[in-house]
Amino acid sequence: MAENQYYGTGRRKSSAARVFIKPGSGNIVINKRSLEEYFGRPTSCMVVKQPLELVDMVEKLDLYITVKGGGISGQAGAIRHGITRALMEYDESLRPVLRAAGYVTRDARRVERKKVGLRKARRRPQFSKR
């Protein structure tokens, strides 16, 4: 592995992302595709770029990302978490800024399981008085 490469693992829902950061020109590659090509929707692209915009390093770092599992939203969240961790490895002084924005904390919310006798996790069958 290169000397000036920094790594972070991010997770969200059932997605896991591995993020490699190195000094560069702001090139973001996700699963061998560009950011805009991988995430069609602008919302997901915005979520991915949030930690970089916060510390003003969008044009200063190149990112190589592999992500597996889950859907679009979960993958975007996992990538954001991974980028945050890699940035903290790159420069520890960024931690308080990223912490204040809420990017350091792993979002532990998961899909609640379906229960027996119910239609969904909490949705009960329709009640009939007679």
UniProtKB/Swiss-Prot annotation:
- Please give one Gene Ontology molecular function term for this protein: structural constituent of ribosome
Q: What keywords appear on the UniProt entry?
A: Ribonucleoprotein, Ribosomal protein
Query: What Pfam families does this protein's entry cite?
Result: Ribosomal_S9
Q: Which domain of life is it from?
A: Bacteria
Biological process GO annotation list?
Answer: translation
GO CC terms? cytosolic small ribosomal subunit
Q: Which SUPFAM superfamilies does the UniProt entry name for this protein?
A: Ribosomal protein S5 domain 2-like
InterPro entries assigned to the protein according to its UniProt record, in alphabetical order: Ribosomal_Su5_D2-typ_SF, Ribosomal_uS9, Ribosomal_uS9_bac/plastid, Ribosomal_uS9_CS, Ribsml_uS5_D2-typ_fold_subgr
Task: Write out the similarity annotation.
Answer: Belongs to the universal ribosomal protein uS9 family.
Q: What is this protein called?
A: Small ribosomal subunit protein uS9
Q: Which organism is it from?
A: Vibrio cholerae serotype O1 (strain ATCC 39315 / El Tor Inaba N16961)
Identify the gene encoding this protein: rpsI
